[in-house]
């Protein structure tokens, strides 16, 4: 039976793979789906976000125990030393459809997104990124900690402590062209109340597949190919899992709900384009920090992501839309603007 939550109710809410104490600030109906404005205890209001019910748990002893178990698991994972050797795996296809070979041993680590685990192998000799990707890039080059303006709760009572989540340990170097594009994207949607037409063509999956074809012939051996395939498959997984939870601006959520109803059996990577994918790289360093991936796997993944971003810049005319759509009046009334 679905649980409904009330304003000011104390709850637990998933942010990444961990549960945090939070309270319900506001509620809103999007079609037949209830969304909740969440304020995380101890976090500034810039971190408030609209979430659906599947990210919220009731404040119960059982769920508090789950919160503690998840936290302890994350701590033990970070303290665990990287294994230098791993047993040979048997030939099989993993859940992403990418074949792994039993003819060799390789290091691997598990990436968990919203409860689903997927393996990514680790590799060495990758380059670290040099500059952080801002959570919101302004035209003057400065950054803002929030992705769009959020409604502050009327009750501005102080929490027991004022603390924001730590900055990600890892960084993704985003080309300036894409940083400026993110700014324009934010303005078009949140200020101009425009939308990107969905379904998009080419899609996220198509863009990643095209990059794969351009890259794979330059890899040196079968192991490098396998690592690259796993990394690209992982990127698709992250996008599918994160889109509805953290990649949409409030003005887009109604469109997202309509798309889900219209295409119930289609993955989001086959409907959305790179315009939404590049938003993922704002939050990806933080998400990666919370996985149990070893440092070699992380550096390998980030290296391929940065190459992919450079590829998108070279082919920006092919992958990025030229014009946004004006939202019709009935859509604006549904959104409440």
Curated annotation (Swiss-Prot):
This is Chromatin modification-related protein eaf3. Residues 6-56 form the Tudor-knot domain. Component of the NuA4 histone acetyltransferase complex which is involved in transcriptional activation of selected genes principally by acetylation of nucleosomal histone H4 and H2A. The NuA4 complex is also involved in DNA repair. Also involved in deacetylation of histones, chromatin assembly and chromosome segregation. May act as a transcriptional oscillator, directing histone deacetylases to specific chromosomal domains. One of its GO terms (biological process) is DNA repair-dependent chromatin remodeling. Residues 166-336 form the MRG domain. Keywords: Chromatin regulator, DNA damage, DNA repair, Nucleus, Transcription, Transcription regulation. Residues 70-169 are annotated as: Disordered. Disulfide bonds: none annotated. Residues 137-158 have a biased composition (Basic and acidic residues). It is found in: Nucleus. The keyword Transcription regulation applies. Belongs to the MRG family. Component of the NuA4 histone acetyltransferase complex. Heterotetramer of alp13, clr6, prw1 and pst2. SUPFAM superfamilies: Chromo domain-like. GO terms for cellular component: NuA4 histone acetyltransferase complex; nucleus; Rpd3S complex. The gene is alp13.
């Amino acid at each position: 039976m679905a649980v409904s939550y009330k304003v000011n109710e104390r709850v637990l809410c998933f942010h990444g793979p961990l549960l945090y104490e939070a309270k319900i600030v506001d509620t809103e109906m999007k079609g037949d789906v209830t969304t909740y404005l969440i304020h995380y205890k101890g976090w500034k209001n810039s971190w408030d976000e609209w979430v659906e019910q599947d990210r919220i748990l009731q404040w119960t002893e059982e769920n508090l125990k789950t919160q503690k178990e998840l936290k302890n698991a994350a701590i033990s994972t970070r303290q665990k030393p990287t294994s230098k050797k791993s047993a040979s795996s048997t030939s099989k296809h993993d859940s992403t459809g990418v074949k792994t070979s039993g003819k060799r041993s390789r290091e691997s680590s598990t990436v968990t997104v919203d409860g689903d685990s997927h393996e990514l192998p680790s590799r060495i000799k990758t380059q670290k990124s040099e500059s952080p990707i801002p959570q919101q890039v302004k035209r003057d080059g400065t950054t803002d900690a929030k992705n769009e303006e959020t409604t502050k709760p009327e009750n501005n009572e102080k929490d027991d402590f004022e603390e924001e989540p730590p900055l990600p340990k890892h960084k993704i170097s985003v080309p300036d062209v894409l940083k400026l594009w993110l700014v324009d994207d934010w303005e078009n949607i949140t200020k101009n109340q425009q939308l990107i037409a969905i379904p998009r063509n080419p899609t996220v999956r198509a863009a990643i597949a095209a990059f794969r074809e351009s890259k794979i012939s330059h890899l040196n051996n079968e192991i490098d190919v396998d690592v690259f395939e796993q990394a690209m498959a992982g990127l698709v997984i992250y996008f599918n899992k994160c889109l509805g939870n953290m990649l949409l601006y409030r003005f887009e959520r109604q469109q997202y709900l309509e798309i889900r109803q219209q295409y119930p059996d289609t993955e989001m990577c086959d409907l959305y384009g790179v315009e939404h994918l590049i938003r993922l790289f704002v939050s990806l360093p933080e998400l990666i920090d919370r996985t149990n991936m070893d440092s070699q796997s992380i550096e390998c993944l980030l290296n391929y992501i940065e190459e992919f971003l450079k590829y998108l810049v070279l082919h920006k005319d092919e992958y990025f839309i030229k014009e946004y759509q004006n939202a019709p009046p009935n859509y604006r009334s549904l959104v409440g603007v």
